[in-house]
């Protein structure tokens, strides 16, 4: 049996743009994508800290160091510049792969520049092994 697990996330990123008339996707600074182990065209879930809205779409790279977080297409109705979001990537894992899973959490500042990267290890006995 496979399980859907968190493999990486960008925590508390600030939306910089919302482009309703674009085809779709979320455009994310390429440095943030790499740090969170998110590939171009990978499906991600975007969650608003303002209103708990969740949206699934695919990620596209923005120029490195740009700090760009742009929701394109329909989610532009739900996410506005200045909103804080969590961008989560997931993967399907076999039971025997889960023990080796080490999701990356990328923390950013108000300009979406990387402040810290944490690797979260398997939780055992109620404590995360980091």
Residue ranges and their predicted role:
Residues 5, 15-16, 20-94, 99, ...:
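Compact, glycine-rich, soluble single-domain proteins
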Residues 3, 8, 97-122, 126-130:
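Peripheral, non-AAA+ core regions of ATP-driven protein-machinery
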């Amino acid at each position: 049996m496979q399980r859907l697990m968190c493999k990486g996330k960008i925590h508390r990123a600030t939306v910089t743009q919302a482009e309703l008339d674009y085809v779709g996707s979320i455009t994310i600074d390429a440095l943030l994508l790499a740090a969170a182990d998110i590939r171009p065209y990978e499906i991600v879930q975007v969650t608003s800290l303002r209103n708990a809205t969740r949206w699934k779409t695919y990620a596209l790279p923005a120029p490195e160091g740009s700090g760009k977080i742009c929701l394109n297409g329909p989610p532009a109705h739900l996410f506005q510049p200045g909103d804080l979001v969590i961008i989560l990537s997931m993967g399907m894992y076999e039971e025997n792969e889960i023990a080796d899973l080490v999701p990356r959490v990328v923390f950013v500042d108000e300009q979406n520049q990387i402040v810290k990267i944490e690797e979260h290890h398997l939780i055992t006995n109620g404590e995360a092994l980091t």
